[in-house]
Amino acid sequence: MIQSTQPITALLKLWESERLITPLDRHFALEMAQLHKVDLHKAKSGIDLVNEQGEQAYSELFLLICALLSRQLSQQHTCLPIHQIRLDNPMQEPISNCQILCSHSEIIALLAQFNAISSPELEQANSPSTPIILDSGDLYLQRYHQFEIQVASYLTQLADAEVSELPAQLNTNSSTNISANTSAISSTLDMLFPQSDDMGVTDFDWQKISTATAFTKRLAVITGGPGTGKTTTVTKLLFLLTQHADMTIRLVAPTGKAAARLSESIKASKLRLKQELAPFADKIDLSSLIRVPEEASTLHRLLGVIPNSPKFRHHKDNPLRLDLLVVDEASMVDLPMMHKLLSALPEHARLILLGDQDQLASVEAGAVLADICAGLKQKNTRTNASDAKWQMRYSSDYSEYLSNLSGFDLSPFVSPLPKIGDSLCMLMHSHRFKGDAGIGQLAGAVNNSDKDRIMQVWQTGYDELQWIEHLKTNAGNSGLDELLTQAVSHYRHYLEMAKDSKDASEIIDCYNEFRVLCAMRAGEYGVDGINQGVTTALKQAKLITADTEFYLGRPVIIQSNDYNLGLFNGDIGLILPDMSSQGSYHSSYQSSVEDGNASTHAPRLMAHFIQADGSILKVLPARLPSHDTCFAMTVHKSQGSEFANVALVLPIWPSPAQKQLLTKELVYTAITRAKQHFTCLGSQAVFEHASLQATQRSSGLARRLWSQI
């Protein structure tokens, strides 16, 4: 069954030393092999693959498969598709030390014989659970299998809720019955979304359609790139709902930074909406804008953290107290967290997911938003069109109803696919980037993996785009030197503000004007190396002292959750003087910094973090959980943030393992963090490789939601 240069137990050590698997992967495989044995009689009677090697051959195969399954989870996949295993090189080594000598179908048949593995197709509902599940040719750890099944079930139930059920669930009076008041609701939608002069007869206002969808469905998934108006759309929706119902509405995002941005965006959208609706003051109740919430929180805070426990206060048996939940940056929500969130929703509640399906998937296992939107990627069989605007999927009945409500003929989007398509809407037009703006053009070309267009954009010479080529010589890397000079120029502003006793919020806002993003964490061109380079350059420029661990102006990023302090992985703060206790700087403080002797008169320094509500959380540096300096951060950690200026650093000669991490989603996410200017330090070959390689996360969620794709 297996031909290898060494026993699998020895190869596991080799693969661990070569970082093809983690120590956890190896220990998991060994533990499973020790605890669970093959039923050899069952295997012999099931298939004719037993030879003179007997049980040992089965054990070797089981050991290898367990290591592969654990590695999949380490790489954020939720399952191991057996048919994707490379039989000639299962671990994808530079030179293979192992081959599997049976077919994929035979592997599946063999795995079904182990007492550690059960299959939904074969087992009865009351059968004892097993640690590993084999489902439709995919291998799962039991808990991830349950997460996936239950998330699919929750979402399907929400999507299948009939429109006629909603008024009662919203506790609205009979005069607000949606079906009976289509004309009145349609008129309000017309006021919220007046037709623009440049809209053609065949154009669709997807913001308006999204609002109508979310108004009539318990589940609404609104996806779109940066600047497409997701927050504007949801603000108008919430205003429309508050016209007809007294609802408890909560706004959340995965991180504190994303929650703060959501709050800011909602506030700004409400101000714009009030101005836009002023001409209709005699026809619409503007006072209900007050009932549109502005304050967003994190998912952890919403669910209720229990210190030193993976569980939350709110769950299936103690649901959240709300009628509508809006989740922004949904692409960042992993499968286990989405399961916890959905299970905590009360039965009557609505859910709105906002996000960009083309961004990087969550840091942990799963790609939930991408799986939910998977059906939108299929070509419409009726129109045979591949243009993005033809990717909606509506059932026949709902298409007709939504057409009447929105005023747009949606019949071209009728599809036989499952009804979850009725809950989805993709926003197309970016209002942040003009049609000829370099950042938007580059992001679009990368997202489409259009090699020729990518090069054309770079060669056009857009003012908001800058390319820095790696030029490595014996004297160093002039490209890296140029990037470090740029970093010093940008970071100078907030560091000088810190010396001048400016307001902490203003200093943090200034710091957030620029960020260096890295594809990798380790290495000279990873977060570790770039942070060290920027620190050295700033010290040489006498902008920081860096003689102590917690120096004035040091940015820190939290690497582990501390529920007692209210700090979570990815939170970013600055080491600044605590002005509330000090009152003011000593007059000689700034000069002492410049002389490199700041400790003499320095006021007490605290780590300052902006909270979702705009307040400042101050923490003694010594109490901070695991953290790092944050002049540079990974692209993954930047999700949910925006910066005026972004510099992306790519490695010069990435290893095979690093190449797997360089994807178009990573580059696209980095580009779209920039609002005004984007710089890339890299080589053409590496940028091209990343832009043409799409992220593939193994999951069965899309199959469960879109059973016909």
Please state what every model-predicted region is:
Residues 184-219:
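Conserved pre-motif I regulatory segment
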Residues 346, 549-552, 568, 638:
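Residue-level recognition of short, solvent-exposed, well-ordered loop/turn junctions
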Residues 209-211, 215-457:
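ASCE P-loop NTPase helicase motor core
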Residues 98-171, 181-184:
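Interdomain "pre-motor" coupling segment immediately N-terminal to P-loop NTPase/helicase cores
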Residues 1-96:
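Intrinsically disordered, low-complexity N-terminal extensions of AAA+/P-loop NTPases
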Residues 358, 362-556, 562-564:
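Conserved helicase motor core of P-loop NTPases
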Residues 571, 577-578, 582-709:
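C-terminal accessory regions
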Residues 40-56, 96, 123-124, 163-187, ...:
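Intrinsically disordered, low-complexity terminal tails and inter-domain linkers enriched
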